[in-house]
Amino acid sequence: MKSRLLTVFALTFSIISPATATPNYTVGGDRPVTVNLPDTLANPAPLLILLHSASTSGAHQENYMHLGPVAKKNGLIYIAPDGMINPEGKRFWNASKSCCNRYKQEVDDVDYINSLIDEISKKTPVDPKRIYLIGHSNGAFMSFTFACKTNKVAAIVAIAGAMDTESDCTPSTPVSLLNIHGTADKTIKVTGGVMNNFPYTSATKTVKTIASVNKCSNLATSKKDFEPTIKGTETTVINYACNTHTHLQFWKIANGSHSPKLPTDFAEQVISFLLKQSK
């Protein structure tokens, strides 16, 4: 009788206990990055890649955006890799002529990100139709470049980024985009500018470039309170209607800075946008 009770208890405990999380692992060779896996891993599962701003790191960017817990809860494989280190000891992505390889170092970050995707895909079932990028500043430039040079990206969230004016950005397949930019950004100006002696696009031109690829038009405009330190509904949301399966939005933050204060539900907002997108 006692053994029977122990058996029943063991079965009951196994039913009510949560499943053991799949252990994280490292990829990337001499530029290692931790692959963060969700507790429940779909087959296949979406992959989220966070690309940091110049002079920071993947860990710093995660500390700013707090994507990890929300990615984990929503079944996303998640990585926040680091760019190369320049002679000043600062990290960067070799995204374009204007941003931000100041010392013209020989580094192919498109190849590096590709290699991360390939290495992860060999170990974990990545859904090739749901690969997402979130980039800030230099990381946003890198997100656009990677999407333009490969056909792997389903959607991008870009904060305070742009493209080279002379860029021939023509993704072979449509890419969904949520573009966020503050009008008071003094680093990457919303109206466009010059860095490293090369011009970069305005936020409007950046969005129009993707809109052309996605065959979008028929703008609808609304307001929202996004930046918590600016009073009122400071953010204009420009929503495009696209003739493809993609979605395109431009959130323009009135008086928003280069690194705007993010709302507490920022991760939920952007991951919700991404998870609606597929190639």
What do these predicted regions represent?
Residues 176-180, 213-279:
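C-terminal catalytic histidine-bearing segment of alpha/beta-hydrolase fold enzymes
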Residues 55, 85-86, 163, 185, ...:
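Alpha/beta-hydrolase active-site loop signature
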Residues 155-221, 227-230, 239-243:
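The feature captures the conserved acid-bearing segment of alpha/beta-hydrolase catalytic domains
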Residues 19-21:
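Boundary at the C-terminal end of the N-terminal hydrophobic targeting segment
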Residues 122-174:
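Primarily recognizes the serine-hydrolase "nucleophile elbow" in alpha/beta-hydrolase
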Residues 24-132, 142-145, 264-267:
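Serine-hydrolase catalytic machinery in alpha/beta-hydrolase-like enzymes
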Residues 49-55, 160, 181-182, 254:
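The conserved beta1-alpha1 loop
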Residues 5-15:
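Sec-dependent N-terminal signal peptides
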